[in-house]
A protein has these predicted regions:
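Glycine-rich, basic loop-to-helix element that forms the pyrophosphate-binding segment
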Residues: 42-58
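The conserved acidic donor/metal-binding loop of glycosyltransferases
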Residues: 67-71
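A recurrent flexible, glycine/aromatic-enriched loop bordering the glycosyltransferase active site
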Residues: 97-98, 110-129, 143
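Non-catalytic, C-terminal membrane-associated alpha-helical segments of glycosyltransferases
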Residues: 178-243
Length: 243
């Protein structure tokens, strides 16, 4: 059973979408987390639909959505709920990556810019959201790339989307198809041309430093591969638009 004591009297149900059996380590963390209500493990597909249906099964005003490939510290929920204000609709937190190549890149970027202020990453993999916002949400049928679409939806309702600095969340780094992500970012208008150029410039500048921080040529080629895949997906979608 979830831990019952809750210092701020705000219970929060959890939604954990997963393809198969839920991550046992994450489930153990949630069951013992202060302020946690019921844990809803859903296997709907795609992920965007699973999130919506799961949240609507919850009974609490605020609902936590946590991806199956995440790990959270014991005080995660209490720390996040402290940031709730009447104007906020969703709150995410910066997570550290288990994937050493991506972790190196974000570590380098974080030395020059606050990762919680980056407008290109809403951190949808560990957030709390007002349940009522899901009632009229019409999610695209996506497994990857829903982040920006969902953030814009929340903002259009009049609420703010807030990202907190690193509180201890860990992303275990499920492999993603960056061609698919590039297609989604173009198709659903996540990035305009300016943001695309900004992303590519940042990746070009910081990738060598990430490789240097790991002392690994493999890190350089891994990150370069992701960048090329993302751009290929973006260009592919533009070509399809013209046909």
């Amino acid at each position: 059973m979830p831990a019952s004591r809750c210092d701020n009297d705000l219970k929060v149900d959890f939604v954990v979408p997963s393809r198969d059996a839920a991550n046992p380590t994450l489930m153990h963390q949630l069951k013992n987390m202060q302020c946690a209500g019921q844990i809803i493990n859903t296997h709907e597909k795609p992920l965007s639909i699973a999130r919506k249906k799961g949240v609507l099964q919850a009974d609490t005003e605020w609902v936590a959505m946590v991806d199956d490939d995440m790990l959270l510290p014991a005080n995660w929920l209490q720390s996040v709920t402290k940031a709730i204000t009447p104007k906020i609709g969703a709150i995410g937190t910066v997570a550290v990556h288990k994937n050493k190549h991506i972790a190196a890149y974000e570590r380098v970027v974080g030395t020059v810019y606050n990762l919680s202020k980056l407008d290109t990453n809403p951190h949808i993999n560990n957030i709390i959201i007002r349940r009522k916002l899901m009632e009229n949400y019409d999610p695209p049928r996506l497994f990857f790339g829903e982040d920006q679409y969902f953030k814009r939806y929340v903002q259009k309702t009049g609420f703010a989307w807030k990202v907190l600095p690193f509180l201890g969340a860990t992303h275990l780094g499920t492999s993603k198809n960056y061609v698919t992500i590039g297609i989604s970012y173009r198709r659903y208008g996540h990035f305009g041309f300016y943001k695309l150029v900004r992303r590519m410039a940042a990746r070009f500048i910081f990738t060598p430093f990430a490789a240097l921080s790991n002392l690994s040529v493999k890190t350089f080629w891994y990150l370069t591969k992701l960048n090329v895949e993302f751009l290929a997906g973006w260009v592919k979608e533009i070509v399809l638009e013209k046909l």
